Design a protein with these regions (language model features):
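Non-heme Fe(II)/2-oxoglutarate
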Residues: 2-65
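Amphipathic alpha-helical recognition patches that constitute DNA-binding helices
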Residues: 4, 80, 107, 173
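A structural signal for well-ordered alpha-helical scaffolds and beta->alpha junctions
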Residues: 10, 14, 45, 54-58, ...
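Aromatic-rich, lipid-facing transmembrane alpha helices and their immediate juxtamembrane interface loops
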Residues: 12-25, 67-68, 101-102, 187-189, ...
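Non-heme Fe(II) oxygenase catalytic core, chiefly the N-lobe of the double-stranded beta-helix
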Residues: 18-22, 52-104, 110-115
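A structural signal for the main folded, soluble domain(s) of proteins
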Residues: 28-31, 35-37, 64-71, 77-82, ...
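Catalytic core of Fe(II)/2-oxoglutarate
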Residues: 87, 95-99, 103-104, 114-220
């Protein structure tokens, strides 16, 4: 199951997050402790990321998904702010399904790219496997202040197609993951991220995939 929501966050708050990002000098890559880096970007980023793991938003997700014990991950394990420049591409995959003795149940993607053109690609793809082939069921343009929410399971394949924006633009998204004590639609065993249909030629075209905020930060 999946849904797209439009314009549910204040535009001025997201504008503030973009301003925080633009003022932050970042390079590829330095690892920092998960969940403790948002303060490096600015007040707007802290306010938004605190809200995304806070009680009000999580209760909204519980009511939407009917997962009554849904919990946020305040450590932001594997999640955070993603900056994806021209040449970026994320192959279809299913996610790791367990963390801290809980089952991963819901993914939330909040897009931050302004004035994104359809021909620039970077569409969020949701799909399934038929035989040996990956089939795209739905594509979402990564438009500013749009949110895509989908259940996480052993068959919830997703990724994004090749980003072809100008060099001075980036595909930008905040990813958030939510967990439950109930297994849901997962298989019997825990699993790691599982990629399918890996296109090595398109992989070579990827200039770099710059992730920061929870896992990566600027070099001092």
């Amino acid at each position: 199951a999946h849904i797209k929501l439009e314009n549910i966050f204040p535009n001025d708050l997201l504008d503030g997050v973009l301003s925080d990002i633009e003022k932050t000098e970042y390079e590829y890559f330095k690892f920092c402790t998960v969940g403790n880096c948002f303060s490096e970007f600015g007040e707007s980023t802290v306010k938004l990321t605190d809200y995304l793991v806070g009680d009000e938003w999580v209760e909204f997700l519980r009511n939407m998904t009917e997962i009554k014990d849904l919990k946020s991950d305040k450590s932001w394990h594997g999640a955070g702010i993603n900056i994806e420049p021209r040449g970026s591409h994320l192959e279809p995959h299913t996610d790791f399904n367990e963390f801290d003795h809980m089952w991963r149940r819901v993914n939330v993607l909040l897009f931050l790219s302004k004035d994104w053109k359809d021909e620039w690609g970077g569409h969020n793809e949701l799909g399934h496997i038929e035989g040996q082939n990956y089939v795209v069921d739905r594509k979402y343009k990564p438009e500013f202040n749009n949110v895509v929410i989908f259940n996480t399971s052993h068959y919830s394949y997703h990724g994004f197609d090749l980003v072809s924006c100008p060099n001075d633009k980036n595909r930008m998204v905040i990813s958030c993951y939510y967990y439950s004590n109930e297994r849901g639609e997962h298989g019997a065993a825990t699993s790691t991220t599982n990629y399918v249909g890996w296109d090595r030629e398109r992989k070579k075209q990827k200039e770099y995939y710059n992730r920061f905020g929870t896992g990566w930060r600027k070099l001092k």
